[in-house]
Curated annotation (Swiss-Prot):
Belongs to the bacterial ribosomal protein bL20 family. Disulfide bonds: none annotated. Keywords: Ribonucleoprotein, Ribosomal protein, RNA-binding, rRNA-binding. The keyword Magnesium does not apply. InterPro entries: Ribosomal_bL20 (IPR005813), RIBOSOMAL_L20_CS (IPR049946), Ribosomal_protein_bL20_C (IPR035566). It comes from Thermotoga petrophila (strain ATCC BAA-488 / DSM 13995 / JCM 10881 / RKU-1). Binds directly to 23S ribosomal RNA and is necessary for the in vitro assembly process of the 50S ribosomal subunit. It is not involved in the protein synthesizing functions of that subunit. This is Large ribosomal subunit protein bL20. Pfam families: Ribosomal_L20. The keyword Methyltransferase does not apply. The gene is rplT. GO terms for biological process: ribosomal large subunit assembly; translation.
Length: 118
């Protein structure tokens, strides 16, 4: 018996062409190219999710560094002072405090300076 798969094949092609709808030129009209670009786009989104974590951490560290330097400490000294003081607060929260609540951030800087002095 011969295998008839027109329905399945059409459904599969339609899925890829629908996903490639916004692509330019032949990439949105030709099945083979649309499928290649679809796979590539999924790879880019996967990699992007990994890079996002690095980028956010860099942003938090930059914000903390700027705020700490305004108070007279380098970023590394500030983090070391917090570790010596036994304060466990993550960089995301510290950067939020540095941006939105400078008074609370100054308290952490004060704690770090006291720990470094002793």
């Amino acid at each position: 018996m011969r295998v008839k798969r027109a329905v399945h094949a059409k459904k599969k092609r339609k899925k890829y062409l629908k996903a490639a709808k916004g692509y330019r030129g032949a990439l949105s009209r030709r099945y083979k190219l649309a499928k290649q670009m679809y796979v590539r786009s999924k790879w880019y989104s996967y990699v992007g999710r990994k890079l996002k974590k690095r980028d956010m951490r860099k942003l938090w560290i930059t914000r903390i560094n700027i705020a700490a330097r305004n108070e007279g400490l380098k970023y590394s000294e500030f983090i070391h002072g917090l570790k010596l003081a036994g304060v466990s607060i993550n960089r995301k929260m510290l950067s939020e405090l540095a941006v939105n609540d400078p008074e609370a951030f100054r308290e952490y800087v004060k704690i770090a300076k006291e720990a470094l002095a002793s």
